[in-house]
Amino acid sequence: MVVGAIPFDARRPGVLYRPVRVVVEQAPSPGAVVAPTGRLDVIGQSPDPDGYRRIVRKAVTAIRSGAMDKVVLGRCATVEVSHASEVWRPEDVLARLRASNPDAYVFRLDLDGGMGGLFDEPGILLGASPELVLSCSDSRIWTLPLAGTIARGTDPASDIRAARALLSSGKDLAEHAHVSRAVVEALGRHVDDIEMPSGPQLVATPVVWHLGTPIEGVLREGRSPLELLYDLHPTPAVCGWPSTPARDFIARCEGFDRGLFAGLIGWMDVNGDCEWALVLRAGVLHADRATMFAGAGIVAASDPASELRETATKMMTFTSALGELVDPPVIGLQIPDPPTANAVGRPTPAASRRPH
C-alpha cells in the first residue's frame, strides 16, 4: 500500500509513503471541540483581492475570445496568530475540521519540505475535502466531480433560496457541464457500464452548496486504476477545460506555485483498490503561521466580485478551524453562524460515501 499526496502538476514528484503498519478504524466522534479564541493576522496574500479580480477579468476575456471554455483560478492567504497558541496544535485543528465537516474527507499529512514555493518548509497539510476523484474496490469505480458553488444561507429559508438559486443558475450549470463531460470522457477510456444521473445533484458542506454528479462504473479488464487516476487528474474542477490552455493560463497568471494544493490525497493498495480526494478546503500549518488555498471556476459569465466571494466562502472551512480573521478583505466576508436546519435536504451521493 502507498499513502500520501500527488501535486496539482502530476509531472512533479509526490509525497508518498509505504506504511509499515496500517490501522483501519472508525474515526472517533470529535465530541465537544472548544472553539479557538485567538485572533489571526494576515501577513500575505497571493494574489490579493484586487489582483484576483484582475486575473478573473483577464480569464473571462480569454474565454470569450475562444481560448478556452473554463479555467479555475486560486489564491492563497497566509495568517499568523499571536495569542491562543492551542490553535496551532494540529490535532486540535484536525478535530475542528472533523467536527465541522463530518461528511468530508478529512486528512493530515506531515511534510518534510523541499518541494519549493508554499511547500518548501516542513509543515503539516490539513484539510476537509468534499470531492472524491476516484474510489476503486474490486474493479468497481466511483467518482464525484463538483463544480458550481453558492454560499449556504444563515437560516433555513435563505438556505433553501440559495440551493434553488444554484440549481437554476445558468452560469453554474454550464461550469458543471464542462467538468462532468470531461470526467465522463476520461472514464470512457478505461471504464465500462458507466452510470450517472441525468443532471447534477446538490451536495452540501457546512459553508457552501455544490453541484455534484455521482458517477460509477466497472474498470475495463487489463486497465489500471492508477492509469485512470492520472488520466482524470487534474480534472476541470481544479484546472479548467481544455486542460492545456487552462493549465498554461494558471501558470502565467495565478502568481504562485500550487504544489499540493488542488492535488490528490489518498491511498492505493497492491490490488488497485484506492480512494483519492482533491486537496481542497485545506491549509499548511507551521509553528507560527498557516497558509490556506481556495479557487473558483471561471467561465464566460463569471463576475470577478462573485468569484472572489466564492474563494472567500471556501476559505472559511479552514479559517473556522483556526480562528476568525482580523482583516475581512482576505476572506471577503465574516464567518456566519451555520443554518439551524436544512429544509432542502442533504443529498449524499453513493459515489462520495461508499463504505469500505
Identify the meaning behind each predicted range:
Residues 239-245, 249-356:
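Glycine-rich, small/acidic residue-mixed loop/short-helix segments
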Residues 21-50, 54-57, 76-85, 142-252, ...:
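Contiguous alpha-helical scaffold segments within structured protein domains
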